[in-house]
Amino acid sequence: MGENHDHEQSIKRNSMIYNENERQLCNSNLKILQNKRALSKNDSSSKQQVQDSKPRRALTDVPVNNNPLSQNKRIVAGSKAAKVRREENIRPIVSAVQKRQIYNDRTAAEQEEEEEEEGEDDDAASIVNKKRRIDAEGVSEIVGWQDLDYVEKDDTAMVAEYSAEIFAFLYRRELETLPSHNYLLDKTSKYYLRPSMRTILVDWLVEVHEKFQCYPETLFLSINLMDRFLAKNKVTMNKLQLLAVTSLFIAAKFEEVNLPKLAEYAYITDGAASKNDIKNAEMFMLTSLEFNIGWPNPLNFLRRISKADDYDPVNRNIGKFILEYAYCCHQFIHLPPSTVSAMAMYIARRMTNRNKNELWNGTLQHYSGGIDPIHDEAFQSLCIDLVKDIASSKTHLDSLILKYKKPRYGSVYFQTFKWCTSEMHSNFQNLFNLK
């Protein structure tokens, strides 16, 4: 009995000790929680003091006059800016319409006031039937052109205020990135290559480019890189395919978002080039070209002229085919991209004949860089040579022709070939005839 009593007393003592420990632990947790709340209050109050002590604008402390998007007007409120940031985090790729909404920092009243001012000055702001000088080298005064950049001045995605400077730079840059000479016509050159060999290469490039589903800009850049390299380097026959695939490999890195894998380039050569061969050739090409890759793509100029053509989809499709065809022909590789683009658009408009009275007006002349097809005999000669080549199929571009026979590209080859053939038979009586 005595042992049982001692055991019960021991259990009671242990229970009391345990309860005391639990009580102390609860008190400790309570103090920790109170301290956290106190710290939180102090932190929030200090932040509020800092915010209250320094008045800030919605986005930055920079004066509104330094914001090029604000145009000395009120900038976006803080809540609206926060909403924009959240939307940008959720959707990093924003459409042009959304961009216009994001950067539109004017109030409704200010917009209405500006529209009223524009309505009063429409006649003064319009450049129609006025004489203006183009900001480009060697371009004479052009009468009666419409400033389409001014029409798009409220579209921030079009950066209309910088368009003249951008294209003035591109016109200079295109001359710096041409092949040093036409190595296909100068038989005395030590870099001379038979035109038929280049035709095989570029036609194969068109086929591979189509299989890889790359951007059109990638094809033009790859041809430019290949021509610039061949104009200053002698390449043996068994290395020409390696050169072509490496040119496409470099161009895709420069232009594409989703790149084909290196193994796919090696596979497409059917054993003519390994992965290591392509990597070594890439370094050799880049060194030879001094890593000077960027160039004014001809599609930039075609889109520019297409703006003056009211973005006609038929003319643009035909223009793209003629542009690709011209770049695959050996006799045009020394021409600036802006000239070839103007040739493509002029022939396309001549084919469709949609506005015969204004085949090439002042606006088209301005947006083509000052080219006047009706009075420029050198330009006319180039267009005739191109039409002849398409009609006679001197340049055997089977892959390119097959590509533009597809409905995906509007099947424009059939219409183009038919028209070019009729022009050649009529001795080009209609090509530059405005009657």
From Swiss-Prot:
Q: Which family does it belong to?
A: Belongs to the cyclin family. Cyclin AB subfamily.
The protein's matches in Pfam families, at most eight in alphabetical order, are given as:
Cyclin_C (PF02984), Cyclin_N (PF00134)
Q: Does the keyword Cell cycle apply?
A: yes
The UniProt function text for this chain reads: Required for efficient progression through S phase and possibly for the normal progression through meiosis. Interacts with CDC28.
Misc remark: Present with 521 molecules/cell in log phase SD medium.
Q: Does the keyword S-adenosyl-L-methionine apply?
A: no
Protein name as it appears in the record: S-phase entry cyclin-5
Q: Where is the composition biased (Low complexity)?
A: 41-52
List, alphabetically, the InterPro entries matched: Cyclin, Cyclin-like_dom, Cyclin-like_sf, Cyclin_A/B-like, Cyclin_C-dom, Cyclin_N, Cyclins_cyclin-box
Ordered alphabetically, the record's keywords are: Cell cycle, Cell division, Cyclin
Q: Name one GO molecular function term.
A: cyclin-dependent protein serine/threonine kinase regulator activity
GO CC annotation:
cyclin-dependent protein kinase holoenzyme complex; cytoplasm; microtubule organizing center; nucleus
Q: Where is this region: Disordered?
A: 36-70, 104-126
Acidic residues bias located where?
A: 110-124
Q: Which GO terms describe its biological process?
A: cell division; DNA damage response; G1/S transition of mitotic cell cycle; G2/M transition of mitotic cell cycle; positive regulation of DNA replication; positive regulation of mitotic spindle pole body separation; premeiotic DNA replication; regulation of DNA-templated transcription
Q: Where is the signal peptide?
A: none
